[in-house]
């Protein structure tokens, strides 16, 4: 899953995000979602989330959904 739809992401989901500082390189950061920051149901560049470690970025790939 590509992380563009808000309804596919929930707190506790395991994801890869791209941090703002890594947007040019595309370097991805692995983590677990703590908060969903994007309010709209869809975002073409990925839903913005805060990971449990405090990092903020846009979801590029959902590894495991929290059920």
Pin down the residues of each PLM region.
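Basic/aromatic-rich interaction segments and small domains that mediate binding to polyanionic partners
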Residues: 2-67
